[in-house]
């Protein structure tokens, strides 16, 4: 996994400041309506994907194809069950978030290792089947191999999360 705190200041269009907790649970927004410099955003994702590939060499090659960026707004009621991604690498970047939720896990991204591990519990068994929670704080960023599962904890009333999701084409 590659972690970073990436300041989105200067990349967000004024329309990002007009977002609120009111609206559909999941809103897909064209990236160019929220991100003013898509080339700069792509470069930031590319840096994370390169770092991820370097940490996993030789099993995970750096992306040679395109990096696709999607922008979503998550609001009350949105959640995503654990699922994998067909991309070789995927990354999330929290661009903005509304008020802090009552439950710290509300709107959090959960990254999990879907492997169950060895049948005999041991210290080595803890290497498999673990998970990591990334809270919905502006600037939070993580890149992971696409085979890891990701989920989103249910978003609370009065909360919204603006997120850019990048994936590499296989």
Stretches with model-predicted labels:
Residues 1, 88-90, 141-143, 161-163:
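Intrinsic-disorder/low-complexity, polar/charged segments enriched in Ser/Thr/Lys/Arg/Asp/Glu/Gln
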Residues 1-61, 68-70, 78-79, 108:
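Non-heme Fe(II)/2-oxoglutarate
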Residues 15-18, 94-95, 166:
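Short, Φ-rich (hydrophobic/aromatic) sequence segments
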Residues 45-48, 136-137, 150:
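Hydrophobic, well-ordered secondary-structure segments
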Residues 63-65, 85-87, 158-160:
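Residue-level preference for beta-strand/loop junctions
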Residues 70-141, 153:
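Catalytic core of non-heme Fe(II) oxygenases with the double-stranded beta-helix
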Residues 90-93, 158-170:
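A short hydrophobic beta-strand segment most commonly corresponding to one strand
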């Amino acid at each position: 996994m590659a972690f970073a705190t990436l300041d989105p200041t200067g990349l967000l269009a004024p329309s990002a400041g007009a977002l609120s907790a009111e609206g559909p649970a999941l809103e897909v927004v064209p990236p160019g309506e929220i991100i003013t410099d898509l080339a700069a955003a792509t470069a930031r994702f590319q840096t994370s994907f390169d770092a991820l590939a370097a940490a996993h060499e030789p099993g995970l090659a750096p992306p040679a194809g395109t990096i696709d960026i999607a922008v979503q707004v998550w609001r009350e009621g949105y959640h995503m069950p654990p699922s994998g991604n067909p991309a070789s690498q995927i990354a999330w970047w929290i661009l903005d978030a509304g008020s802090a939720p009552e439950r710290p896990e509300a709107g959090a991204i959960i990254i999990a290792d879907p492997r169950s591990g060895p049948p005999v519990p041991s210290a080595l068994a803890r290497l498999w089947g673990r998970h990591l929670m990334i809270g919905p704080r502006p600037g939070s960023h993580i890149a992971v191999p696409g085979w890891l599962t990701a989920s989103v904890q249910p978003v609370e009333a009065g909360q919204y999360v603006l997120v850019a999701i990048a994936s590499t084409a296989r």
